[in-house]
C-alpha cells in the first residue's frame, strides 16, 4: 500500500477514529433480486432495489464508518449517506457466466475509476473470483485484469479495495464439506498472490479462511476442522499479507459472524475491520416487500440497528487499525 496524502484522506473517511473499517456492504444486485423474489411473484423492479438501498443508507450509515454501493442501483443511496460516512463503489459486473468454470472478471461497461471518483466515492472496489489451482493461462489473464484496475486507481489517486472470492473449478457447491476441506488453502494462497505490490491494491476484502459450520463448536453437523486447526488457518491468513485486510460476512447470520470475528482475534488475526452486508440488513427485505417502506424502516431502526451496534462492539474488541499495516 503506497499511501499518498490524497489516499490517506480517503482512507480516514472510510474508517472510524480508531482506524477500523466498519463498513456496510450493499452492492448486491443479483443476490438482492433473488432475495426480493422470495417474497413476491413479480420480477423485482429497479425502483424497489434503489428504494431499499436508500432506506438502508439513511437508517444505518450513522452507525457505520462507510458504505459500499453499486453504480447500477445504488446511486440514489449515495446521496442518502450520513455526512461522516465514507463511500465505496463497486466496479465489477454482478455475477459470472455459469456456462463456464472460468468466472472471468468484467468491469461495468460505462464506468471507470475516474467516473467512480467523480461520483464522490472514496474508493474503488472490485470483486474477483479466483481459484489458485486453475490453469496458469487463466490466472495470468485474471492477474493482468487486476493490474489494469490497480493502475487506473493509481492514476486517479484513489484507494483500491480488491475483494477475493476463492473457489474450486471442480467443486460446484461452495457450502459443501468437500469444498470446506480445501477452502483454507484456496483463500490463503489467493491472498498471497494479490499482496504483490504490482497490483497496487490498498485493502484486501477477504473471506474468513474456513467454513465455520464445519469447525468444532460452531456447527452442529460434521466437523472437518478442530478449533486448533481453524485457529492456525486464521493465523496463517494474517501472515499471508502485509496489506490491510477486512472480512466479508458472506451472507452468514449476524451472531455467527460476530462469533467468527472473536475467534479470528483470539487466533491472532490482526484484521482491520469488515464489509458486512446481508448479516446486517437481510431481514429488512421481507418487511419491505410484504409490509412496505415504513415496516422496513422500523426493522432497520430496531433489529438492523442492533445488528450493526453489536458488530461495532465486537470490532472494538477485535479489529486493529489499518494504519498499523502501512
Swiss-Prot record:
Pathway entry: Carbohydrate metabolism; D-tagatose 6-phosphate degradation; D-glyceraldehyde 3-phosphate and glycerone phosphate from D-tagatose 6-phosphate: step 2/2
Lipoprotein keyword on record: no
Catalytic activity line of the entry: D-tagatofuranose 1,6-bisphosphate = D-glyceraldehyde 3-phosphate + dihydroxyacetone phosphate
GO molecular function, one term: tagatose-6-phosphate kinase activity
Intrachain S-S bonds: none
Keyword Nuclease: no
Pfam families assigned: DeoC
One record GO biological process: 6-sulfoquinovose(1-) catabolic process
InterPro entries xrefs: Aldolase_TIM (IPR013785), DeoC/FbaB/LacD_aldolase (IPR002915), LacD_aldolase (IPR050552), Tag_1.6-dipho_adolase (IPR005927)
EC number: 4.1.2.40
Alphabetic keyword roster: Lactose metabolism, Lyase
Family, as annotated: Belongs to the aldolase LacD family.
NCBIfam families per record: lacD, PRK04161.1, PRK12399.1, PRK12858.1
Name of the protein this chain belongs to: Tagatose 1,6-diphosphate aldolase 2
Gene source species: Streptococcus agalactiae serotype III (strain NEM316)
Biological classification of the source: Bacteria, Bacillati, Bacillota, Bacilli, Lactobacillales
Amino acid at each position: 500500500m503506497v499511501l499518498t496524502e490524497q489516499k490517506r484522506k480517503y482512507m480516514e473517511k472510510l474508517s472510524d477514529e480508531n482506524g477500523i473499517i466498519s463498513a456496510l456492504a450493499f452492492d448486491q444486485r443479483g443476490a438482492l433480486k433473488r432475495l426480493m423474489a422470495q417474497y413476491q411473484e413479480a420480477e423485482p423492479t429497479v425502483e424497489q432495489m434503489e428504494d431499499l438501498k436508500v432506506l438502508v443508507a439513511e437508517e444505518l450509515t450513522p452507525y457505520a464508518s462507510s458504505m459500499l454501493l453499486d453504480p447500477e442501483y445504488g446511486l440514489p443511496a449515495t446521496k442518502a449517506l450520513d455526512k461522516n460516512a465514507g463511500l465505496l463503489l463497486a466496479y465489477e459486473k454482478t455475477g459470472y457466466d455459469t456456462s463456464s468454470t472460468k468466472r472471468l472478471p468484467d468491469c461495468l461497461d460505462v464506468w471507470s475509476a475516474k467516473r467512480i471518483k467523480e461520483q464522490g466515492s472514496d474508493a474503488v472496489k472490485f470483486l474477483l473470483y479466483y481459484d489458485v489451482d486453475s490453469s496458469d493461462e487463466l490466472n495470468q489473464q485474471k492477474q493482468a485484469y487486476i493490474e489494469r484496475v490497480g493502475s487506473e486507481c493509481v492514476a486517479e489517486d484513489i484507494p483500491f479495495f480488491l475483494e477475493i472470492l476463492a473457489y474450486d473449478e471442480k467443486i460446484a457447491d461452495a457450502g459443501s464439506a468437500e469444498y470446506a476441506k480445501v477452502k483454507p488453502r484456496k483463500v490463503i494462497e489467493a491472498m498471497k498472490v494479490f499482496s504483490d505490490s504490482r497490483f497496487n491494491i490498498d485493502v484486501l476484502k477477504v473471506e474468513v479462511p474456513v467454513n465455520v459450520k464445519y469447525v468444532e463448536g460452531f456447527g452442529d453437523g460434521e466437523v472437518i476442522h478442530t478449533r486448533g486447526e481453524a485457529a492456525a488457518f486464521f493465523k496463517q491468513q494474517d501472515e499471508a499479507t502485509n496489506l490491510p485486510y477486512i472480512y466479508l460476512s458472506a451472507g452468514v447470520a449476524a451472531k455467527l459472524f460476530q462469533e467468527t470475528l472473536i475467534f479470528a482475534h483470539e487466533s491472532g488475526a490482526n484484521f482491520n475491520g469488515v464489509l458486512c452486508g446481508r448479516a446486517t440488513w437481510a431481514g429488512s427485505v421481507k418487511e419491505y416487500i410484504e409490509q412496505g417502506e415504513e415496516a422496513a424502516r422500523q426493522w432497520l431502526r430496531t433489529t438492523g440497528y442492533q445488528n450493526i451496534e453489536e458488530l461495532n462492539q465486537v470490532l472494538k474488541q477485535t479489529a486493529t487499525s489499518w494504519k498499523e499495516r502501512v
